[in-house]
């Protein structure tokens, strides 16, 4: 029984990995059908539906992976790091680095892969970025509590600016067919970002 569960779990993971790889390839710029996905995995469409009731559920599973990966690591950063600018830097690098290591998933994060899918999926991605923005805003607000001095500008405005930087780098990565890495020249950009905050 346990072996059958492992086989089913492995097949589910194989399907999700194939979908992510297709999103990374040139197929990712077009609608990915279950027929194409089944052919890529080497199974029938019926076999796909034994593991996932719909393509939407496949995307849901990938979004869940993105959410879990980013939010759990953001929580670790907040737990381990106390200095405001280090926290912000690490959160930005986390989002950019995750996208760089997972180009297919970046198409989901930018909404590019969801254009032909249910609106609810885009809503989940919107919520993810709102959660990241809330975390950035919280880090910015805590500076006043930690250091006794806040920022000149409103923390909500600054958090939006930081998130816009991330989203812009992800968009550039997808638009360039993954040529321009999101973390490329980050160390050179970071002082410019800090200057905007102060």
Curated annotation (Swiss-Prot):
GO cellular component annotations of the record: bacterial nucleoid; cytoplasm
> Where would you find this protein in the cell?
Cytoplasm, Nucleoid
Parts forming coiled coils: 119-144
* Entry-linked Gene3D superfamilies: Tetracycline Repressor, domain 2
Q: Name one GO molecular function term.
A: transcription cis-regulatory region binding
Q: What is its main location?
A: cytoplasm
Q: Report any one BP term from Gene Ontology.
A: cell division
Give the UniProt keywords, A-Z.
Cell cycle, Cell division, Coiled coil, Cytoplasm, DNA-binding
Question: Where do the HTH tetR-type domain residues begin and end?
Answer: 9-70
Residue numbers of the DNA-binding region are 33-52
Domain of life, per UniProt, equals: Bacteria
What do we know about how this protein assembles, alone or with others? Answer: Homodimer. Interacts with FtsZ.
Q: Which family does it belong to?
A: Belongs to the nucleoid occlusion factor SlmA family.
Name used for this protein in its record:
Nucleoid occlusion factor SlmA
Q: Which organism is it from?
A: Yersinia enterocolitica serotype O:8 / biotype 1B (strain NCTC 13174 / 8081)
Gene of this entry: slmA
């Amino acid at each position: 029984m346990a072996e059958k569960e492992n086989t089913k779990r492995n097949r589910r993971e194989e399907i999700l990995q194939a979908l992510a790889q297709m999103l990374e390839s040139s197929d990712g710029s077009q609608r990915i059908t279950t027929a194409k996905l089944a052919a890529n995995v080497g199974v029938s469409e019926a076999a796909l539906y034994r593991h996932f009731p719909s393509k939407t559920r496949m995307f849901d599973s990938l979004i869940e992976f993105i959410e879990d990966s980013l939010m759990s690591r953001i929580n670790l950063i907040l737990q381990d790091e106390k200095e405001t600018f280090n926290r912000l830097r690490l959160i930005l690098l986390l989002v950019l680095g995750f996208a760089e290591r997972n180009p297919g998933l970046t198409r989901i994060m930018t909404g590019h892969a969801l254009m032909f899918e249910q609106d609810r999926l885009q809503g989940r991605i919107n919520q993810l970025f709102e959660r990241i923005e809330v975390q950035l805003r919280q880090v910015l607000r805590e500076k006043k509590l930690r250091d006794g001095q806040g920022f000149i500008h409103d923390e909500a405005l600054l958090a939006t600016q930081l998130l816009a930087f991330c989203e812009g780098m992800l968009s550039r990565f997808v638009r360039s067919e993954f040529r321009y890495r999101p973390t490329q020249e980050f160390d050179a950009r970071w002082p410019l970002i800090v200057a905007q905050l102060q």
